[in-house]
Regions:
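Short amphipathic alpha-helices and their capping/turn segments at secondary-structure boundaries
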Residues: 6-21, 59-64
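Structural recognition of the beta-strand scaffold that forms the well-ordered cores
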Residues: 19-24, 69-73
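Conserved small/polar residues in nucleotide/adenosyl-binding loops
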Residues: 1-4
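Aromatic-rich peripheral "rim/lid" segments of glycoside hydrolase catalytic domains that contact
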Residues: 32-57, 61-108
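Active-site environment of divalent metal-dependent phosphoester hydrolases
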Residues: 28-30
Length: 108
């Protein structure tokens, strides 16, 4: 996960002193997507482990930033027939997200 992006965002958050959430946080299950998680055109081999590892790294990096108040996970389809590479349902990343959200709920 690119910590320099968090540094860049932190400057703006501190300047304006406003709450911050990631309205869309996600990474495809395509090999190489952890380097460019916002590139939805990336083609390649499916890599569920890379997607799960990206979520672990993102949560780990963000928990060190007290100004990060939440995440909207992209993509959570309403139908499994329309499952995209960003979808986490029935993939290892789903368990990573569930564990993180459960941990956060216990610490409230």
């Amino acid at each position: 996960y690119k910590r320099q992006q968090l540094d860049r965002i932190e400057e703006v958050v501190k300047k304006y002193q406003k709450p911050f959430i990631f309205s869309e946080a996600g990474c495809m299950n395509i090999h190489g997507s952890a380097l460019v998680p916002n590139n939805w055109e990336l083609q390649g081999k499916e890599d569920d482990a890379e997607q799960a590892d990206w979520y672990l790294a993102m949560f780990s990096a963000c928990e060190k930033r007290d100004w990060v108040k939440g995440f909207g996970i992209w993509d959570w389809p309403g139908s499994m027939e329309r499952k995209s590479p960003y979808a986490v349902c029935d993939r290892p990343a789903e368990a990573v997200i569930a564990e993180e959200y459960s941990r956060c709920a216990k610490n409230r």
